[in-house]
Amino acid sequence: MKAAVVEQFKEPLKIKEVEKPTISYGEVLVRIKACGVCHTDLHAAHGDWPVKPKLPLIPGHEGVGIVEEVGPGVTHLKVGDRVGIPWLYSACGHCDYCLSGQETLCEHQKNAGYSVDGGYAEYCRAAADYVVKIPDNLSFEEAAPIFCAGVTTYKALKVTGAKPGEWVAIYGIGGLGHVAVQYAKAMGLNVVAVDIGDEKLELAKELGADLVVNPLKEDAAKFMKEKVGGVHAAVVTAVSKPAFQSAYNSIRRGGACVLVGLPPEEMPIPIFDTVLNGIKIIGSIVGTRKDLQEALQFAAEGKVKTIIEVQPLEKINEVFDRMLKGQINGRVVLTLEDK
């Protein structure tokens, strides 16, 4: 089968023929139709996170396609089902985290396109219990980004605890942030969009943001305090330490700051202010299978629509180069042509 393979960190991926995976008990073989491209894939290809991915590696954790083979013990899926393979490739299923609905915190999880091969290939082996079905009225290209960008921002908004009518700030209106604005509006929240690009703020307005602010032109936290008394919650998708600091300062008493982006720096927290003002600081990573089902349903109902750019798998190195330069609008989705 054709695949894009990381053979050495920080080297271009190689488009090559590799062995088609075989499946065993509890697994399915998925014929990949499309796979979204995420910044995490770039980190995997560069090997620049503390825990390195396996090598060689087929990246991709937004792979979607059709079940082509069903292994022994699989009863809830059949050949022809439309499914996606998320970042949470599998978890142990019996630890405290798994049993309490926090499977994304399982210490024995496997991750698609990182610890196991992912969706940058014509076929992908998957743990049947962890693939998620795609609603019939959602195309593969539309569905792919929901498996990471969608569910990640949807879950982040859920954990803010913000209620309909309250204010939430979305920091960074990129691949995740532009989806977050739409989920927030669909959930009945008022939205302040924050970005250093005016074109991104115009997009946020088109997507329903109630207020926008460019922190290069004015103090974003001060703007929010003056306009709405501070936001009830902030979700930071930007990979930027200043964005995290501004988000913290934008929150009213009793509010929540949810961290999603992964900048390399440390972030100092003023303990006195945090305690005195009852500020909650929450880390949020992707979402559970249930979160993903809910996120997909929003998209299927037309309430959330990812801005996508479709490219063939062979263009992956060009896509990575553009991603490094910040030249991607929305999300890139790779497609794989049928043989």
UniProtKB/Swiss-Prot annotation:
Temperature section of the record: Thermostable.
Superkingdom of origin organism: Bacteria
Requisite cofactors: Zn(2+)
Keyword Calcium in record: no
Keyword Ribonucleoprotein: no
Cofactor note as given: Binds 2 Zn(2+) ions per subunit.
Entry keywords, A to Z: Metal-binding, NAD, Oxidoreductase, Zinc
Reaction(s) catalysed by this chain's protein: a primary alcohol + NAD(+) = an aldehyde + NADH + H(+); a secondary alcohol + NAD(+) = a ketone + NADH + H(+)
Function of the protein: Thermophilic NAD(+)-dependent alcohol dehydrogenase. Bears mainly an ethanol-dehydrogenase activity.
Family listed: Belongs to the zinc-containing alcohol dehydrogenase family.
Name of this chain's protein: Alcohol dehydrogenase
Species this protein is from: Geobacillus stearothermophilus
